[in-house]
Structures are given as C-alpha cells and as structure tokens.
A protein has these predicted regions:
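Active-site donor-nucleotide binding/catalytic segment of nucleotide-sugar enzymes
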Residues: 73
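A structural preference for short, pocket-lining loop segments at secondary-structure junctions
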Residues: 64, 69-70, 87-171, 176, ...
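C-terminal alpha-helix plus adjacent terminal tail
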Residues: 1-64, 111, 243, 264, ...
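Extended acidic/polar regulatory tracts at the flanks of large eukaryotic scaffold/adaptor proteins
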Residues: 76-77
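Phosphate/oxyanion-binding active-site loops and adjacent basic polyanion-contact surfaces
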Residues: 80-85
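Hydrophobic/aromatic residues within transmembrane alpha-helices
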Residues: 69, 106, 127, 190-191, ...
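Crotonase-fold acyl-CoA enzyme core
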Residues: 164-278
Length: 333
C-alpha cells in the first residue's frame, strides 16, 4: 500500500533534482533517457519484416506510411502503470526508428468496460488503483516524462550527438494522436507532445492533478502554450474539464469529427501529412522547440519536477484524495 511506504524514494527525487540542476550532468541524463531501448533495437528488424508486434500492454502496427502505437490496458480503460510503461516506450522507439514509415500515430485500443463496449478509449491516465496500492514507484513518473513522452516530443537520441536543438539533434518523426472517448491526466499530457490531434466530437480532456495530489508530468510546462496561463491553472489546479469540441478544446485538438469517422479521418490526415513527403517535418519540429521548449528548459523544469513530485507522491494528501475522489480503498487490482 502506498500509505505504508516509508518514503525513502524521496531521496531519489532529491538526488535526480540535483543532477538535473547542473547543466552538464542534467543534459547528459536527458540524452541518456532519449536513447532507444535495447529491446527496440533488437526487435526493429522484426517489425520491419512483419509490420506488427504485440507486446501485450502495447502494440505497434504499420498502416501504410504510418507506424501506429496503441496502448492496450483494457481492464483499466487504457490507464498507464508499471506494466504498460516499458512496452509503450519500446513501441514508440520502434515507430520512430522504423525506416518503412514516415509518421507515427498514438491510439488507445479497445477496452472491456461495458459502458464503452466495442469502443476504443485513448487514455484514463495513471492507474489510480495501482497508485493507491503502492504499485507505482516514484521513478515511474520520471522515466515516463524523460523517456517515452519526451521521445514523442523530441525524437530518439544517438550516443554520439547531443539531442539539443542548437548543438545536435535527434532522429524524429511527426506524431498524430487519435483521441477516442477521453484523455485524462497522462493521456492529456501525451496530446501536448503531439504535432496533430484528431478527436471525436464526444471526447474530452482533463488534468485532475488536484484530485490526484500529484504534478501532471510536463503539463505545467506545456499547457500554457495552448490555453494561456489562466485556463491552464483552471485545468490543473481546479480540475476544469475541456470538451474537445469547444473553443478551448480546439486549441489542443486540430480536427473534431464524428466518433464513427475516426479511423477514416486519421488515415486521411496521415495521407495529407505524407503525400508530399515529410522531409522538412523534423526540421520544423526542431525550429518550434528551439523557441518554445529547448532541451535546457526541459532540464530545468525536470529539476523542479523530480523534487516536488517526490514530496507529492508520499504526501498523506495523496492517499486522502484517492480515497475521497476515487473510492480507492474499495477498488481491487
């Protein structure tokens, strides 16, 4: 149980905060976390040959010119936890490095819940039941935000070249998200790292950090670019729900379509992106980041995040919030 932990992991957060606070050491850590996973390198040839790999908690499939990564946690509405993180990152690495595709797509797979029977759901965010039961370690947050999410935003690094936008670069592709149903918490965080978002007209986004008692990844760094400081604070600190088909929602979602048109529309968006090639896509992504969020800015943010998330993760308020808002004590793994 999370409430029974001694909190020794707080020292991990403080240590990583201090590492990231030093420019050279922090940039080295950022680069290391952007390197492809060894499993992705090992299985890249398999994907090139077969066009599909199912890891269980995540899968990847080549559809035309797109490498489609799907999170598959059907019992928990495609929530993220310690069982899904590694496979999602490996799948993302393979998608980015795949020489036979030009663009990447992020989806949530079909779920088991009777309310959403036969439907795909993008993401329910962090698995709050696992969090309450002590199954989410502190390093999970840091590995996720410096790993898979940052790889989607920045690309995959190499061992000999800095991933910094000014002095080096990464191997990267554009990312499209297909938002079915909802993007809660970490699901919404993924959207802020995407280049294009297609959403169903019934879909919504939330960042319920107040009810969870944690910091919502890099959303505090990125959300203001989309919504401005006031609405970003309302979303993160007051739990404001953002309907995708609303003025605020359309500042994150590029295209709103009927739910039954998602597959067709995503395929058309992929075609529009790739019909003239994507030669300049990586260059334009780097140019945006150089102004909006250079790697050094991310490093400085993560220095604060590692420390503050450690305190949040072991706060009695986290347990109280999960019991009050999630009825966590009555839920089973």
């Amino acid at each position: 149980m999370q409430s029974e932990k001694d909190g020794v992991e707080i020292d991990q957060g403080i240590f990583l905060s201090q590492v990231l606070a030093v420019a050279d050491a922090g940039m080295h850590l950022c680069q290391s976390m952007l390197l492809p996973r060894p499993e992705a390198v090992e299985r890249g040839a398999e994907f090139l040959r077969s066009g599909a790999i199912n890891f269980g908690p995540a899968k990847i499939e080549r559809q035309g010119k797109a490498a489609v990564v799907s999170v598959c946690n059907p019992r928990f509405l495609n929530a993220e936890d310690d069982d899904t993180l590694d496979d999602t990152e490996i799948a993302a690495d393979i998608a980015i490095l795949d020489p036979a595709s030009e663009i990447c797509v992020l989806r949530g797979d079909f779920v088991d819940h009777p309310k959403y029977k036969g439907r795909k759901i993008f993401s329910a965010g962090i698995n709050l039941t696992h969090l309450y039961r002590g199954k989410i370690p502190l390093l999970w947050y840091i590995r996720r935000d410096m790993g898979v999410v940052n790889k989607m935003f920045r690309g995959v690094a190499t061992g000999h070249t800095s991933p910094d936008e000014i002095y080096g670069g990464t191997h990267e592709k554009p990312w499209i998200a297909g938002l079915d149903g909802f993007a809660i918490g970490g699901g919404c965080q993924y959207l802020l790292a995407m280049d294009y978002v297609v959403a169903g007209s019934d879909a919504y986004m939330t960042l319920p950090a107040r009810k969870e008692g944690i910091i919502p990844g890099a959303a505090n760094l990125r959300l203001t670019r989309f919504l401005g400081a006031r609405v970003a604070r309302q979303a993160i600190m007051m739990g404001r729900r953002l309907e995708c088909d609303s003025p605020e929602g359309r500042r994150i979602c590029d295209l709103i379509v009927a739910p039954d048109q998602m597959e067709k529309t995503i395929a058309q968006v992929v075609e529009n992106f790739t019909s003239s090639g994507v030669v300049s896509a990586a260059s334009n992504r780097r140019a945006f980041r150089a102004w909006e969020e250079p790697l050094d800015t991310f490093r400085r943010y993560m220095a604060v995040y590692c420390r503050e998330q450690a305190y949040c993760h072991f706060s009695p308020a986290l347990i109280a919030n999960l019991e009050r808002h999630w009825n966590a004590a009555q839920r089973k793994i």
